[in-house]
């Protein structure tokens, strides 16, 4: 077993003093918060009109997003009017492979190879 230095054994025996063994920069929780993070949150109404440039940017982004959503919904409706949805081939192939594997295992486990040994 590895021998411990006296300060390490002291830390094991007295856990409340382990704080003194840590280097200063590793105790990040004791540091004051970063000055940029001290700004408090503000409550803003969604429909409120204001003269701040940040909120104008947000409202223009929101209208852009709503236009994108409306175009996506229109696309969904046009596909629904055709009456069918084109599925990819992967689920069908997976189902076929699964059925073949299950059939093969069933035949092997029930003794199909024994039929060839006359």
Swiss-Prot record:
UniProtKB keywords: Membrane, Transmembrane, Transmembrane helix
Biased composition (Basic and acidic residues): 13-42
TM stretches of this protein: 96-116
Disulphide-bonded residues: none
Subcellular location: Membrane
Membrane topology annotation: Single-pass membrane protein
Protein origin, superkingdom: Eukaryota
Region (Disordered): 1-84
GO cellular component terms attached to this protein's record: membrane
Name this protein carries in UniProt: Small integral membrane protein 17
Organism field: Homo sapiens (Human)
Gene it is expressed from: SMIM17
